[in-house]
Amino acid sequence: RALRPDPGPAMSFFRRKARGREQEKTSDVPSGKASISVHSPQKSTKNHALLEAAGPSPVAISAISANMDSFSRSRTATLKKQPSHMEAAHFGDLGRSCLDYQAQETKSSLSKTLEQVLRDAVVLPYFIQFMELRRMEHLVKFWLEAESFHSTTWSRIRAHSLNTVKQSSLAEPVSPTQKHETAAAPVTESLDQRLEEPSSAQLLLTQSEGIDLTDRTSNTQNHLLLSPECDGARALHPAAARTGARRASLEPQESCRLTVASRNSPSSPLKEVSGKLMKSIEQDAVNTFTKYISPDAAKPIPITEAMRNDIIAKICGEDGQVDPNCFVLAQSIVFSAMEQEHFSEFLRSHHFCKYQIEVLTSGTVYLADILFCESALFYSSEYMEKEDAVNILQFWLAADNFQSQPAAKKGQYDGQEAQNDAMILYDKYFSLQATHPLGFDDVVRLEIESNNICREGGPLPNCFTTPLRQAWTTMEKVFLPGFLSSSLYYKYLNDLIHSVRGDEFLGASASLAAQGSGGPPDDPLPGASDPSASQSSVKKASVKILKNFDEAIIVDAASLDPESLYQRTYAGKMTFGRVSDLGQFIRESEPEPDVKKSKGSMFSQAMKKWVQGNSDEAQEELAWKIAKMIVSDVMQQAQCAQPGETSAKL
């Protein structure tokens, strides 16, 4: 043994394992006897032999532990190392992304489609309020109820199918040919476990409802056949029979009681639940039809008579079942009507502005909300221009547009044209002679040159994914926090708030005009049936508001031309009148007859000036007005000096 070469720790371990197996073979019979003598029949001879087998040697244990230590160190190093998609967190020239750009949602919370509005719990109340003002809220409510009916009906049908399967499995007879050693104990234990649970016991007591008399008789006979089998099992296994004797003796009584209960019970709970589910489906379908589709409905949806008959046929099916898709076609028609007639107006209404204000003031504004909303992107581009980083935004917009066009064509695009467009972006932002260099490193530039742009067949749609990801992260981590705390962001919010107030002011005046016409507020507008009449009434109300709008408007004097101060309607002294030398009170608040009133309010004059600008005609008109004012002032002074001279002569 000393001269034998050391086989190594692994071989030593396997040899000791083989010795343990030999000992297991030789100690099979004695270990079985020992297990019987200590009254432990549950422990097999094989498990007892494995307990006596020798373990690995200390050399093998040390070798295995060394391997485990090295594996744990490598695993720890792998965990500490950043994944392949996790690039460096520093920004450098343009920054690195720690996000997967492909997974970024190209959706903005500030711009929504109709489907997104109907499925968003935040903006949906604003849309319902808008439709209520137009008296079209029944379209939205029908779509929501039909969508809820569609989803809940399928879930109820699945529940009904599961209950049917459970009922059929519980009604299966017990086979009398189950002959194995421990048959009595599992059967009785499962029966007791099912009877211990209240719901299972109730189901078992009433499981045979709907089965004919022959099936009930066969089930009773099958249950009764268990008792001789249990006697045989007790003869083979005395210990197991002792533990389950009481349960096996009660088996025939329980089966008879179950059979009698099944005969006496009027209905099964499973069938009752299934029946209630199907009745609830029918009730919901009838309620929706009565509220929105029936000709007698208060506000029916705009569908044809043929479509109404088709919905009736799907609700009252030949098999007695309601089709879950009975309202799908009507949903599509209502959806297209809302999208074509109302949704564009909703996006321009103060209701959607209120929703945008709620999103912008929620504290969770993301970069996608800004980049995919035109109004927010306008203010963001101004901020990026002030920060001398507008080239990053322009690159992102151009590259994203480049990638979206070939992707929309699903591979059917001109490779040469795509390569020319990609070269324009490369020459502008990536090359060493770039006109607007963004600071991409050599790795990114070589990747775009060799692998993406110079590819046979043209560049792939995702050729600018890496620089797009870097530009996205730079804007998100560096510039987005500054924009959200800048004055331009608050100006954007202020503009939204002013637009909401203006729209509410117009809506309030229109409602007052409708009430003043003599009709009650709940009735439709008098000109609701005539679109031209309604439009003319709205125009009249808006003109009336604009005439008095200069009283409430706040004008920044610094933004106006100082010469416009001479264009005031009442440019006299800040007095109501004066007393002459003769003691006569002369009113100055009355306009002079030779001075013409300026047409339009301050708001209209400001709008004219903003539209016309500093043109030659405007300057000439302003000069004539100033000259007239000077002449009138001289004439007034001459008239004031004339009574004094006459009194001196006297």
Curated annotation (Swiss-Prot):
The keyword Cytoplasm applies. Keywords: Cytoplasm, Membrane, Mitochondrion, Phosphoprotein, Repeat, Transit peptide. One of its GO terms (biological process) is protein localization. Residues 1-45, 168-192, 512-535 are annotated as: Disordered. The keyword DNA-binding does not apply. Residues 113-356, 366-493 form the RGS domain. Residues 525-535 have a biased composition (Low complexity). InterPro entries: AKAP10_AKB_dom, Cell_Polariz_PKAAnc, RGS, RGS_sf, RGS_subdomain_2. GO terms for cellular component: mitochondrion; plasma membrane. Gene3D superfamilies: Regulator of G-protein Signalling 4, domain 2. The modification Phosphoserine is found at S40, S268. One of its GO terms (molecular function) is protein kinase A binding. Disulfide bonds: none annotated. Residues 622-635 are annotated as: PKA-RII subunit binding. Residues 1-16 form a transit peptide. It holds the Pfam family RGS. Its main location: mitochondrion. It is found in: Mitochondrion; Membrane; Cytoplasm. Signal peptide: none annotated. Differentially targeted protein that binds to type I and II regulatory subunits of protein kinase A and anchors them to the mitochondria or the plasma membrane. Although the physiological relevance between PKA and AKAPS with mitochondria is not fully understood, one idea is that BAD, a proapoptotic member, is phosphorylated and inactivated by mitochondria-anchored PKA. It cannot be excluded too that it may facilitate PKA as well as G protein signal transduction, by acting as an adapter for assembling multiprotein complexes. RII-alpha binding site, predicted to form an amphipathic helix, could participate in protein-protein interactions with a complementary surface on the R-subunit dimer. This is A-kinase anchor protein 10, mitochondrial. It comes from Sus scrofa. The gene is AKAP10.
